[in-house]
Amino acid sequence: MIGWLQGRVLYKQNDQLLINVCGVGYELTVPQSVMASAQVGEELTVFVHHVQREDGQFLYGFSSFLQRQLFRELIRVSGIGPKLSIVILSGLTPEALIAAVRAQESAPFLRLSGIGKKTAERLLIELHDRVEKNDLFLCDESESSRAPIALSASEEAIQALIALELAPAEAELWVKKAQKTLAEDADSAALIKTAFALRLQGAK
């Protein structure tokens, strides 16, 4: 599963981003806070929620670990899917959402498109205990919960191969084989290219 990505923004529109990570384009659905910080041609790092279904794979990107965790709690609420969860996180900061749930205050939710009184009440009821019992939601977001700066070249290569539908163990195996044939300072692009070549050759 893809947990986070760092790459160059190629395209942005509405709630959709396309970023280039080591030559692989990833499409993500993101809240407006991420969209506002994304600039075409510049680097962007996001935490990712990766959904695999019969009709395809879907990626949702977030500015912090906390925001992603809130998304995961929101989609567990009855009747709240990924689309509406993105709307909620576009209209409320993580801190504002947590504060509203703790105070059982529906007004912030009612101001958002697609949320009526019954939905707001259901959100407050179902999220309350989860917010109160999860230490992540009981304290301010720390530096350690924000998106990390960079992956190592090998980690980037493994992640790219997994995105291309190799099993994690297989991706790691071929990247390790590639490392043995390349210089120690080989970048992720070289590792990906060599790993694919070795795999095609059936290297053992």
Swiss-Prot record:
Per the record, the domain comment is: Has three domains with a flexible linker between the domains II and III and assumes an 'L' shape. Domain III is highly mobile and contacts RuvB.
**InterPro entries (UniProt xref):** DNA_helicase_Holl-junc_RuvA_I (IPR013849), Hlx-hairpin-Hlx_DNA-bd_motif (IPR003583), NA-bd_OB-fold (IPR012340), RuvA (IPR000085), RuvA_2-like (IPR010994)
Return the annotated region ranges for Domain III.
152-204
Region Domain II, as annotated, extends over: 64-142
Q: Where is this region: Domain I?
A: 1-63
Q: What are the protein's UniProt keywords?
A: Cytoplasm, DNA damage, DNA recombination, DNA repair, DNA-binding
Similarity remark:
Belongs to the RuvA family.
Would the keyword DNA repair turn up in this protein's UniProt record? yes
Would the keyword Cytoplasm be found if you checked this record's keyword annotation? yes
State the protein's name: Holliday junction branch migration complex subunit RuvA
- Disulfide bond annotation, renumbered to this chain: none
GO biological process: one example: DNA repair
